[in-house]
């Protein structure tokens, strides 16, 4: 049996990142992945502006000024933020300005009003300043032609402000990936319908769908398919038409109605791995058809969810080139004993907080869903190991 890392690496080698781009409104671009480099088409600021409320001056006109020997300048105009008027420079003159307002040509500094007598027709300057003081040059923040953001950037709120400052409203972003879910098994029924004898409700698809949509992944197709080989083929092909990734659940083991291995083979899918060194979820299958990954998971809820968490997010991160989709792996100190020793590597459901990890008290079975409700991670347990309180263990947080 292959190690999980080997299985994942082999699957990633068979698919290519999705490079389709679409344009969305700036108001819809946050949390998307930038599809193109952004190059500034203008200077920021686009005009010389004041960084303070005060008086625009020629710095040399303040030479020698202090509170004992103030310099008096004549006020020849007043500009507020949003005004743009050329007021020619005259020696010994100043223009009243506010923070963000235009500074006319010929003036090269702004004396803050606290260093003056707040004069209205003429102003006394109490401090000598140098050129550039409280003065923002054209392009001081951003130069025209400068690359501002690189393709692949995960856009955050601060990026929205940056794009808006450049006047950009339509933003090129990578198309969101789509993942369809096909739940197989004649025993499955959809929630909201009366449960018939011998049937169970389909729970796995709703866990997976919620997890994906929470991260912005579209799920165009979620359906149940009974154990019928020809119908399974039809449904998988239908999924491939609208999705970049297909997830199936159930039918991957060796029972008479476990049809997925045969169905995938007859469809011409290239099997990348099966029967990895892991419990639960040993019979998980990774395959590729029409250049798209198909991840076939166990029909047991925890087995399906744990292996989904391990494989899917790394696959999604690779296809989108979005590192934020990668899972968080770290180490923690175990609080509870886990005496069960396994021949295979094992994913043990758990709850981690502040560097410590605890185990649920209920039965640890791949078909048991109820004791997952308080879990936020699994322990990645090496084969042949018995866990004791105080042991340091590897964990992977759920997305």
Task: Please provide the spans of the model-predicted regions.
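Residue-level signal for inorganic ion chemistry
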Residues: 11, 54, 145, 181, ...
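Helix-rich terminal scaffold detector
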Residues: 4-5, 169-297, 301-307
């Amino acid at each position: 049996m292959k190690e999980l890392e080997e299985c994942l690496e082999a699957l990633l080698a068979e698919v290519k990142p999705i490079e389709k781009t679409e344009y969305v409104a700036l108001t819809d671009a946050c949390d998307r992945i930038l599809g193109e480099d952004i190059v500034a088409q203008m200077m920021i600021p686009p005009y010389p502006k004041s960084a303070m409320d005060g008086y625009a001056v020629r710095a040399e006109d303040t030479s020698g000024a202090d509170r004992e020997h103030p310099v008096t300048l004549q006020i020849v105009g007043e500009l507020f933020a949003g005004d743009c008027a050329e007021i020619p420079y005259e020696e010994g003159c100043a223009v009243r300005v506010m923070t963000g307002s235009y500074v006319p040509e010929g003036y090269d500094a702004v004396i803050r009003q606290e260093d003056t007598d707040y004069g209205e027709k003429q102003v006394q300057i109490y401090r000598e300043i140098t050129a550039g003081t409280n003065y923002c040059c054209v392009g001081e923040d951003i130069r025209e032609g400068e690359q501002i953001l690189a393709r692949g950037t995960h856009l955050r709120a601060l990026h929205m402000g940056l794009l808006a400052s450049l006047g950009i409203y339509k933003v090129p972003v990578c198309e969101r990936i789509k993942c369809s879910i096909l739940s197989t098994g004649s025993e499955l029924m959809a929630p909201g319908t009366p449960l018939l004898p011998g049937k169970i409700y389909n729970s796995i698809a709703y866990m997976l769908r919620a997890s994906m949509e929470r991260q912005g992944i579209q799920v165009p197709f979620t359906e149940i398919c009974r154990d019928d080989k020809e119908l399974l083929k039809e449904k998988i092909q239908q999924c491939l038409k609208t999705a970049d990734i297909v997830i199936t659940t159930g039918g991957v083991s060796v029972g008479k109605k476990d049809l997925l291995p045969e169905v995938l083979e007859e469809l011409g899918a290239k099997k990348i791995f099966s029967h990895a060194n892991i419990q639960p979820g040993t019979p998980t299958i990774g395959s590729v058809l029409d250049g798209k990954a198909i991840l076939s998971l166990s029909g047991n809820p925890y087995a399906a969810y744990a292996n989904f968490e391990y494989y899917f997010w790394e696959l999604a991160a690779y296809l989108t080139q979005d590192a934020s989709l990668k899972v968080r792996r770290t180490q923690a100190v175990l609080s509870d004993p886990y005496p069960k020793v396994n021949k295979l590597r094992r994913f043990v459901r758990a709850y981690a907080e502040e560097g410590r990890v605890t185990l649920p008290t209920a039965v640890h079975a791949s078909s048991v869903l109820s004791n997952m409700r308080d879990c936020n991670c699994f322990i990645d347990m090496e084969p042949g190991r018995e866990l004791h309180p105080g042991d340091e263990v590897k964990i992977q947080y759920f997305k």
